[in-house]
């Protein structure tokens, strides 16, 4: 039987599964550890998504601080986690059962702001009126 091919540009099932494993493990590690970095202490981190490369050797981790919606807060968190990535990668290697522990790349996640902006736009009375008149 032929293998099902993933369309170009989309992650494979293997990448998605590895990304979820890394996401769950990192969220647990970050919540459990005590960091000396003042940018990481007393901050609750949301790991929104992890995208793995096709060879699973690199992982882009999208993070946001809970309660700090500013772009500066997200950037500060991503920079702090980047400074701690050696420590986090070592801990991650002990937690997951992958052949290689991926290289971690932390990215400030702005998808929540984008979703809020779209939601606000859809709830605008003028847009709602247009949608209801078409339907």
UniProtKB/Swiss-Prot annotation:
GO cellular component, one term: cytosol
Gene3D superfamilies xrefs: 3.30.300.20
Main location: cytoplasm
Classification via InterPro entries: KH_dom-like_a/b, RbfA, RbfA_dom_sf, Ribosome-bd_factorA_CS
Keywords: Cytoplasm, Ribosome biogenesis
Subcellular location: Cytoplasm
Parts of the chain that traverse the membrane: none
The keyword ATP-binding appears for this protein: no
GO biological process: maturation of SSU-rRNA
Pfam family, one: RBFA
Signal peptide: none
GO molecular function: ribosomal small subunit binding
Family: Belongs to the RbfA family.
PANTHER family per record: RIBOSOME-BINDING FACTOR A, CHLOROPLASTIC-RELATED
Assembly description: Monomer. Binds 30S ribosomal subunits, but not 50S ribosomal subunits or 70S ribosomes.
Biological role: One of several proteins that assist in the late maturation steps of the functional core of the 30S ribosomal subunit. Associates with free 30S ribosomal subunits (but not with 30S subunits that are part of 70S ribosomes or polysomes). Required for efficient processing of 16S rRNA. May interact with the 5'-terminal helix region of 16S rRNA.
Protein name (Swiss-Prot/TrEMBL): Ribosome-binding factor A
Gene: rbfA
